[in-house]
Amino acid sequence: MFPTAESGFLDPAATLAGRASVAAKTLVQERPDPAEVPIPELAPQWKKLDLAEILKRPAAFLSISQTNSLYKPWGSQAAEKQWERGTLPATIKVVKAARRAPNFKSFSWIGYPLFRENHPQSIFDKVQYESWIEGLDFDEAKKKADNELVEELRALVQPGDLEFDECALQTAFVGTPLPLELSRKRIEVIVLTGIHLDWCIEGNTRSARDLGYLPIVIGDATATRRIDQQAAAYERINNFFAPVISSDDFVRLLGQGS
């Protein structure tokens, strides 16, 4: 999930059930077609690397926040209409290819609950988390369903995969089983998909780099809250933190030399 760039908080108007359709319509009018947001050319430093060789190293797949909240019309973030934006087919393509590769030793499906009343929190967290759910009337069952992995990806989960929620503001590397999983399996490369590109994906990519991992972001398997913010997020991540490639490029690179 991702707060607005303007305020740092999710826009309450976009989450009010009675106004969700208006917010969604406005959002669509403001943003370009997703097909008009190309994944950028690799930054010069990444062109010096043999990405096919890197993708043969011990690797992990992370899906972040690909939940009902964003992909179902009744979800708490439904105004974004993420189901229209192609991230699920791209993610499925990546997962199926990674399952066939023997070096992919870890698969994690990571939730990001919007409802965080029971999470550890500072006073900053408290007011921010409360702002995300203003106007939402979800009972406990609907809150739980909101953060469940969307069914298209649920069908791809296998025994031994990790399933957990982020509990920090914005990283899966704090307070979760992920660091131990990556350490025990001697992981070097982390492939990321999910939402939002400029929040959970960018933040976890930065964390992965700082911890010594080699993150690779699958651009068409990620999305920003607003499409008009996607190009800038691609450029920022690609220029400073990690290669951003397409799902087709991932499959092609993974198949080289096999």
Regions found by a protein language model. Name each.
Residues T87, T91, I201:
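Aromatic/hydrophobic pocket-lining residues that form the small-molecule binding cavity
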Residues T67-P73:
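Short acidic, Gly/Ser-rich segments with clustered Asp/Glu that frequently serve as metal-coordination loops
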Residues G75-E84:
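Short glycine-enriched, charge-decorated loop/helix-capping segments at active-site entrances
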Residues F115-G135:
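Short, electropositive alpha-helical surface patch
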